[in-house]
A protein has these predicted regions:
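Short glycine/proline-enriched loop/turn "hinge" motifs that connect secondary-structure elements
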Residues: 12, 89, 133-134, 180-186, ...
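Fold-level recognition of mixed alpha/beta catalytic cores in primary-metabolism enzymes, strongest
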Residues: 106, 111-112, 116-222, 370-389, ...
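An extended, acidic, His-containing surface patch that forms the Zn2+-binding/catalytic region
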Residues: 67, 74, 209, 229-232, ...
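Generic non-transmembrane alpha-helical segments
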Residues: 18-21, 25, 40, 44-48, ...
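Acidic-glycine-rich active-site phosphate/pyrophosphate-binding loop
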Residues: 86-102, 166, 181-192, 359
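Acidic/His- and Gly-rich active-site-bordering loop/insert found
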Residues: 2-109, 130-135, 355, 365, ...
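Midchain, well-structured core segments that form catalytic/ion-binding scaffolds
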Residues: 154-292, 298-300, 304-305
Length: 405
């Protein structure tokens, strides 16, 4: 059988090499620097006789789309992941862009989120091409940019422009082999307070932007429950977290500006909408303007992703669960609609904009994403490649046409 031949050819060493190659190419976002890794992926497929499509919404941030055509073009299976990573930050024991193998794990920025998953896609694709596996349906691979900042230039763009169309999809984000169907909505709030830049000696008459910001944030924390109050199913609670505060230049200069960002997460099975959360948030700010003399504050709301859940009876759910059981020995836990995952991903774009049932499923533990000393278990890479291979054969390979090489 063709399946057995491909499964036998899955190589741990090859998966490690591909993962290390990808991790060694920095693609931090911000600022958004995916050009080099996109070139690596494009050349990977060009070297195997394929012609990947390169498309950009923002110059210098290329998405790579590979289309392997089948005989009937139905169904079409999508395998996808993002090429950007968050900045490495501090606290590493090794160089985050010189990946190392230790204790059956690969260490480096992006190993888990999600270049290990990308390596699995590349390896499965090269084996399908190597063994000349005939497809009945189409296989589309999309390597997209900008996921770490919402995905508008990546998955959002390729879906809106109809550059990617499929009947079902798998997003290789780190889920530790949970099968995720529901995700919380993400609302980012950016606050900027304005004051008077002057010497500390003038504090009695100056407006201090940092002091005004701390007063606003204290009020928001006090009113958190009123902003987030809602009726919902399960144990998922909305979240409001102040995650960045930046202000001031020197110890003896009163700051003229201070910026803060706030991350709000809203579960899908909740009657709190993005719009109502914004309105409640704005009400708190309005009251603060009346209470703080001279307060000058700007607010910007960015809806990164609305909460959503996909149907459990989608065809890809059953196929993927069955293939995972063949490899792992147990059925994967299905997450959604309740509870949902706290994470947000490009599945939002593929499902809500493209109506492509797209399961969030892949190697790695989410606790490792964005962490110092990020790592992924090599065994999970092998298992993922095995699962993806089985999914391909179950969905878009006509077994009657498979011949041994």
């Amino acid at each position: 059988m063709g399946l057995d031949k491909v499964l036998a050819d899955i190589s741990e060493d090859r998966l490690v090499t591909l993962t290390k190659d990808l991790v060694a190419i920095p693609s931090e976002n911000p600022p958004g620097n995916e050009n080099a890794i996109a070139r690596y992926i494009a050349e990977f497929f060009e070297g195997r006789g394929m012609r990947p499509a390169i498309t950009e919404k923002t110059p210098g941030r290329p998405n790579v789309i590979v289309h392997l055509q089948g005989v009937s073009k139905k169904p079409t299976l999508l395998l996808t992941g993002h090429t950007d990573v968050v900045p490495a930050g501090a606290g590493w024991n090794t160089d985050p862009y010189q990946p190392v193998v230790k204790d059956s794990k690969i260490y480096g920025r992006g190993t888990c989120d999600m270049k290990g998953g990308l390596a699995c896609i590349l390896h499965v694709m090269e084996l399908l091409l190597k063994h000349n596996i005939p497809l009945s349906g189409d296989l589309v691979c999309a390597f997209t940019v900008a996921e770490e900042t919402g995905g508008a230039e990546g998955a959002g763009y390729v879906v809106e422009e109809r550059l990617v169309q499929a009947d079902m999809g798998i997003l290789l984000e780190p889920s530790d082999f949970q099968l995720v169907l529901a995700e919380e909505g993400v609302l980012w709030v950016r606050l900027t307070t304005h004051g008077t830049t002057t010497h500390t000696l003038n504090a009695a008459t100056a407006c201090n932007a940092v002091e005004h910001m701390t007063t606003i944030l204290a009020a928001l924390m006090k009113q958190r429950s009123s902003i987030l109050g809602c009726n919902h199913r399960g144990n998922d609670e909305p979240i409001l977290s102040v995650n960045t505060v930046q202000g001031g230049d020197k110890p003896n200069v009163i700051p003229g500006e201070c910026q803060a960002t706030i991350d709000i997460r809203i579960p899908p099975e909740c009657d709190l909408t993005m719009e109502s959360a914004q309105a409640r948030f704005s009400d708190v700010l309005t009251r603060q303007k009346g209470d703080i003399p001279g307060l000058d504050v700007d607010v910007q709301f960015d809806i990164i992703a609305r909460p959503f859940h996909q149907p459990r009876d989608a065809e890809i759910v059953g196929i993927l669960a069955g293939c995972a059981k063949e490899v792992l020995g147990v059925y994967p836990e299905i997450v959604g609609p309740v509870p949902s995952t706290d994470e947000d991903s490009d599945a939002y774009h593929f499902w809500t904009k493209g109506q492509i049932p797209t399961v969030y499923f892949g190697p790695g533990k989410i606790e490792q994403a964005h962490a110092a000393n990020e790592h992924i278990e090599i065994l999970q890479l092998v298992q993922t490649a095995q699962i993806l291979t089985r999914v391909v054969f179950d969905t878009i390979v006509d077994s009657s046409t498979v011949r041994e090489n």
